[in-house]
């Protein structure tokens, strides 16, 4: 249980789960603790994410602190171009350099982090706690058994329109063309956002095979997005929501293996 001097820090990722987790943290601790809600601006998210953030500020009754990277212009493509890779076994550099680095500079010792893990993600929380017994985290959605669909419904019941990406059928409000997506997801991005899809193709042309995200299931060879064949289009493909904290949790898990 956090002491009264502890800061409770919620990371708002412009997704429904982090919105509800933040609202619940305010309900649980807003009267007794310093609850901070932070967001990392990313230029590659849909512009409607900013509308959603403003609506949630009204719902929360307080402003959200927006952190913004300046080294890469908060742009994932700039990260990939300058770091010369798109993803490796430790994850994607965009989330590390555009989100985690900002949080590292902002956080204070003793902060308690609010994880937006949903009830479907109990195993991720268990793994994190097992491997980080000295790190204080709160998971209000799991504590209340709330799943992803519950969170969306709660946001709508609060009179807030879900982010445009959800309304198109996507599973989250990550960047348009999130590099954690699979083939079906990228077929959907190719249809809905051809310009952003072409930007990633162009990057892969520049960086070469090391930047390719997908493998041929038969030959096991990597192939570029430009060579993505026809097949199922999956807007609702499950992709982890991109947040500072989930990324920290996953990175810590990989580092300890
Ligand atoms: S949403 Fe995807 S592409 Fe955007 S920063 Fe996170 S991991 Fe990178």
PLM region spans:
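Nucleotide-activated chemistry modules centered on ATP-dependent adenylation/adenylyltransferase
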Residues: 1-257
């Amino acid at each position: 249980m956090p002491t009264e001097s502890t800061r409770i820090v919620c990371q708002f990722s412009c997704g429904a789960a982090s919105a509800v987790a933040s609202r619940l943290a305010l309900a649980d601790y807003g009267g007794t603790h310093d609850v901070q809600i932070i967001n990392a601006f990313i230029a590659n998210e849909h512009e409607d994410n900013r509308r959603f953030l403003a609506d949630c500020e009204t719902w929360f009754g307080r402003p959200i602190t927006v952190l913004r990277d300046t080294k890469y212009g908060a742009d994932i493509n700039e990260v990939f171009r300058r770091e010369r890779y798109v993803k490796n076994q430790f994850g994607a550099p965009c989330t590390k350099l555009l989100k985690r680095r900002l949080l590292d500079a902002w956080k204070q010792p003793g902060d308690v982090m609010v994880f937006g893990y949903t009830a479907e993600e109990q195993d991720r929380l268990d793994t994190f706690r097992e491997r980080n017994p000295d790190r204080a985290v709160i998971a209000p959605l799991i504590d209340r058994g709330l799943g992803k669909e519950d969170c969306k419904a709660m946001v709508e019941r609060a009179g807030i329109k879900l982010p445009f990406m959800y309304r198109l059928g996507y599973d989250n409000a990550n960047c348009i063309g999130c590099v954690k997506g699979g083939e079906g997801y990228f077929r959907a991005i190719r249809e809905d956002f051809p310009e952003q899809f072409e930007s990633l193709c162009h990057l892969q042309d520049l960086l070469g095979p090391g930047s390719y995200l997908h493998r041929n299931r038969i030959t096991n060879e990597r192939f570029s997005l430009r060579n993505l064949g026809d097949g199922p289009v999956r807007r609702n493909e499950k992709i982890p929501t991109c947040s500072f904290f989930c990324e920290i949790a996953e990175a810590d898990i990989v580092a300890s293996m």
